[in-house]
Amino acid sequence: MTDNRVRPAWSEQFSSDAIKELFAQGPMAELTREWAWGGSTGQGVRVAIVDSGVDQDHPALGGRVRGGVAIEFDEDSENYLRTIDEPNPVDLTGHGTACAGIIHSLAPDAELISVRVLGEGGRGAAIQFAGGLGWAVDNDIQVCNLSLSTSLEEYYAMFHRVADRAYFNNVMLISAVNNIPAPSYPSLYSSVISVAAHEGKDPFTYYYNPDPPVEFGAPGFDVKVAWSNGSTMLATGNSYAAPHIAGLVALISAKHPNLTPFQIKAILYACANNVKGS
């Protein structure tokens, strides 16, 4: 999350004078958006929103929320976590609902699953975050939106293990990079799609960046998002860029259900607005 008055870190890599023209090679140059997701609505794809929860009754979500869970810290449990079923999920801040609404706007028939790992004020432990990712991998999720992260290096290995498990189980993780100029996990792992904000408004306009630490740029400035109590607001941040890419991945996954995360990332590259041949 970010204050709307602050420019998110890494977004300057997607300013109009910084975007690099790139060229797809060989068969990659033949890939088109029509082939990738034309006619797809996300039908049959389950998208997890690992966040503050999701307001299932928000009109911007079109009734597509299909329950979820809360991952809570419990020092008396063997692994310090407790998983609570939430057939009627709620959102404790509005942030998760905002992300879910963006995904729904691109992939209206995808199923939205709430994985609540943040509490009041957007607070939560890294172990809850990792536990939520683990739950998604184990529960028939195809796409996972992560508009949150940690910059603490002590958790590098823990999140790397979960990200690898997602990769080898064909669960595509889409992660917003940090809003401040600091490394964040899991966005830095090569198995994850990392996303920052650009200033454009077209939800289908996105760019590929060949330089670390972020790969893709999607709309994330003054985005109209769903929020608490059925409301909407304008929001700015890398948090709101990631679900644009998650929505596209849901469209691709619905049309081509047997693709691996590696293949999906390659398709996104080939179809980016700054890649010739797309």
Spans of model-derived segments:
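Glycine-rich, phosphate-binding/catalytic loops in enzymes
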Residues: 63-68, 161-163, 191-192, 211-212
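Extracellular S/T/G-rich loop segment that most often corresponds to the catalytic His/Ser-adjacent loop
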Residues: 184-254, 258, 262
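Substrate-binding/access-modulating region of protease and related hydrolase catalytic domains
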Residues: 118-190, 231-235, 240-241, 274-277
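Active-site/binding-pocket entry motifs
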Residues: 55, 71-72, 77, 118, ...
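Subtilisin-like peptidase catalytic core
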Residues: 82-151, 256, 270-275
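Active-site core segment of subtilase-fold serine proteases
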Residues: 3-106, 110
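Divalent metal-coordination and catalytic microenvironments
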Residues: 51, 144, 248
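Proline-centered loop/turn at the N-terminus of a beta-strand
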Residues: 46, 111, 170-172, 193
